[in-house]
Amino acid sequence: MLKQIQKFLKLEAASGILLLVSALLAMIFANTDLNQLYFSFLQTEVAIKFGAFSIDKPLLMWVNDGFMAVFFILVGMEVKRELFEGSLSSYQKAIFPAVAALGGMIIPALVYWFINQNSPEYQQGWAIPMATDIAFALGIVALLSKQVPPALKVFLLALAIIDDLGAIIVIALFFSHEMSMQALTIASIAIVILVAMNRYKVTGLINYAIIGTILWASVLKSGVHATLAGVVIGFCIPLRGKNGEAPLHHLEHALAPWCSFAILPLFAFSNAGVSLEGMSLDKLASPLPLGVALGLIIGKPVGVFLFSYVAVLLGIAKVPEGINLKQIFAIAVLCGIGFTMSMFIAGLAFGEEDASESVLALARLGILMGTFVAAIIGYFLLKITTKPSLMKAA
């Protein structure tokens, strides 16, 4: 188990660095003479036709709806593995990070709502500061990897996975549009087939690829967000085959590098490019970016730590052996690194045709500000609280 976590941390840490580079490149492109090339490239129309069926979308939407669906397949598989075999496989293991994650979703949303309560045009962005970017957060942890207790890394992994699950539920419930019953019917049939394949332990991944593609296309046309198809596909991959094969492990192992080093950096490059032209301190201090930034910087750590502390106080959960509440607070601050999933939810909340590009830009700036501050403060707190001398004293 520990070796798997260490291997995962190395992968995610490198991915976190690449995400940062991709985001910086996007900001450079968006704020130099290359900005026209950058934005026009993202709006390039790409069409796929199959008889009467066609999907015609800008390149940016293919990244957000298509490539990110592959990432969500990985998320679905990770959640399933942790629920059945890993750090969430029993009540005792799951309750502490689950309560922490719940606080880390509720309090940031409340902070955002409080700041934007008099700005109805911004209120649909309440879910933006709820998410944690596991790649960025683990990238920071990896910088101090030698002195960070393994139990603390497991806690962060479990919390981030539950966070992802919460984000998936939020997307499903609050960011779906007008429904197409025909497309939903096709999607439902595809899901039934996938569940049956899982039930009868079909291990041929090509079968899941074919039915999964049909599911993704029908969900895309249905009005439900297409990335949710990825989660369903991930959950339907069997953990074990009839002859002891491990299809979920094999697919997870195959997809993880592609997601970490191609899909997520591409998503970051496509979505982090915010033009600062016309921006002012007044705009940066307006309710939208302020709500997002403070939701991440204040709401996240307060929510994660407060709910954890109360759970321990009431005897609902116990602090995992080998770590202390000071270290939990440091991790809680790192949970304010919301980059990837926050950008994704911001695109759903403000990226539609009825929302202006400047509103989405303000949301993204709030995410960048909040993520940067949370990363810096979280790093120093983690460094201080995991010093060997303090560990012995604790």
Swiss-Prot record:
Main location as per UniProt: membrane
Spans traversing the lipid bilayer: 11-31, 59-79, 95-115, 125-145, 155-175, 177-197, 203-220, 254-274, 296-316, 328-348, 365-385
Compartments in which it is found: Cell inner membrane
GO biological process, alphabetically ordered: regulation of pH
Catalytic activity, reaction form: Na(+)(in) + 2 H(+)(out) = Na(+)(out) + 2 H(+)(in)
GO CC terms of this entry: plasma membrane
Alphabetically ordered keywords of this record: Antiport, Cell inner membrane, Cell membrane, Ion transport, Membrane, Sodium, Sodium transport, Transmembrane, Transmembrane helix, Transport
Stored InterPro entries: Na/H_antiporter_dom_sf, NhaA
GO MF term set: sodium:proton antiporter activity
UniProt KW RNA-binding keyword: no
Amino-acid biosynthesis is among the record's keywords: no
Membrane topology: Multi-pass membrane protein
NCBIfam families: NhaA, PRK09560.1, PRK09561.1
HAMAP family associated with the record: NhaA
Protein role: Na(+)/H(+) antiporter that extrudes sodium in exchange for external protons.
Family: Belongs to the NhaA Na(+)/H(+) (TC 2.A.33) antiporter family.
Official protein name in the record: Na(+)/H(+) antiporter NhaA
